Amino acid sequence: MERSDFVDRVIIYVKGGKGGDGSASFRHEKYVPKGGPDGGDGGNGGYVFLRANSNLSTLLTVAEKKKYIAENGENGKGKKMHGRNGKDIIIDVPLGTVVKDFETGEIIADLDKNGMVVCVARGGKGGRGNVHFKSSTMRTPKISERGAEGEERKLILELKLLADVGLVGYPNVGKSSFISKISNAKPKIANYPFTTLIPNLGVVQVDDLQFVVADIPGLIKGASKGVGLGNVFLRHVERCSVIVHIVDISGFEGRDPVNDYFDIRRELEYFSEDLAKKEEIIVANKIDLLSKEELEERIQKLKNATGKETFPTSVLTGKGIREVIYKMAEMVKESKKLNVEGEIVNERVKRPKPIWKELPEKFVIEIKRDGDDFVVAGPYVEEWAKRLNLTQRDGYNKFMELLEKNGLDNKLREAGAKDGDTVWIAGRAFEFKE
């Protein structure tokens, strides 16, 4: 994977499909002169789902599109034929993707199991056909409902890598070399800071235990505040159960391993208290550059300052690496005992009810002034104006009947309307008459 291919945060827009409109058709058959209404219901709009896929390691393909709009439901047809439901969209994302609402920051889902599925935008419910409006007083209803709009929202997708062990430490202390030595990872390695611009993942096998190690780049003093790209990558350490802190014990490039250790520790604490509490060991790398006496003195100083178990190693010669691998395996195994979670594979898609705005219990009419004109408004009025097809004679009549039955004329008088004044209802102008 090239460096530019790694995308771990993206903002996308999702929208469920609109419900299809109900039909206002009538039965037309030979020898059936009064066939009556036979308009079918509209289909429901399609949904948008996110699905965790362990074969993906980046949000790149999601970022390339950014807008995901499900298919609308089909309109109802004659002969009581129901419109087809709109097709769903299923967006595959990497395992470990956290889904947040862009407006509120609320976490909607944490897709931490392979095959896990979450609905992020519901489709609108299809409108009813005229067969639902037939009554003793309306035998040939030329009326149907429009389908509801689908749910829409902006989402933040953040990838938090699902690694068991996180490697932290200043740039150029040997993290990339270490992960390539202990695993199947093949990172690009060079001798300058910020060599690694993406987290490298490697799989380590110890006897019957397999675990994932992540090399977390960009950590320096001030990382939690954005220095050196550190805040971009710190969230990838959050899921790790074990932290391996690598320091350059040689100090040949002017580094002080004790100061370096505490610089990074403070950044972990600033970023997350939970992160700072994770199990940690120290790997003192580059011991091949020191004499025996210098090494013993520096290792003791580091242990005294940190109180942490410390492993002298040389990634170059391989000395001490085996001991670190087995210690990591022991810590991962212990952590897995404490956090036993079953895998969810091919999880059944849970489909909530389609969007259909529930009307308030009480029909409230609001009258607003717009200059000399009067505007009829209110949740009930606005919803019925959307729901009924006002271009249909009976739909329009039913809408006006609802308003009049709930005191429209009295409300207008109370608001000061006089004979001849202009009243706006659902985008149409009427003349008020006493």
UniProtKB/Swiss-Prot annotation:
This is GTPase Obg. An essential GTPase which binds GTP, GDP and possibly (p)ppGpp with moderate affinity, with high nucleotide exchange rates and a fairly low GTP hydrolysis rate. Plays a role in control of the cell cycle, stress response, ribosome biogenesis and in those bacteria that undergo differentiation, in morphogenesis control. HAMAP family: GTPase_Obg. GTP binds at residues 169-176, 194-198, 215-218, 285-288, 314-316. GO terms for cellular component: cytoplasm. It is an enzyme of class 3 (hydrolase). Monomer. Its cofactor is Mg(2+). Disulfide bonds: none annotated. Mg(2+) binds at residues 176, 196. Residues 355-434 form the OCT domain. Belongs to the TRAFAC class OBG-HflX-like GTPase superfamily. OBG GTPase family. Its EC number is 3.6.5.-. One of its GO terms (biological process) is ribosome biogenesis.
